[in-house]
């Protein structure tokens, strides 16, 4: 957050002088504490610490920015949440106190990872692949849910996409694409 209404100091107070409050240290959950440079803001000499799901950059003025690390959060299904918790030290120049900043990371529907497939057939024969161990989805994955993968389009090199019916199987109502050397 970059405005004074939304930084970590917004709801922190000091009975002596709230104007002199500053963040002096930051610590990710389970990590080491790092000093925050006096007079810094998140975008000018701010201190960067890595949490479980992303990186927080925080300044002494309480401003911060958090950047989620998609690879760390890939295991979250769409709509699932996890939290990154950071403990910051607040100082008025004489005494200190600590508080936490909790960032909620929400999973998104990650794109599946389709792996190229190859096969071979004699010129006068047919090759048929069925079942989970032999079809084109066998080596494809989805961080969210590999069990729900389906083929939705197919095309030959240089051709256009052909939609695949959701009720298609290899022996009924299937979509065929004619290539240079045969029909798929």
Which residues are covered by each model-predicted region?
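Extracellular ectodomain surface segments
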Residues: 1-49, 113-174
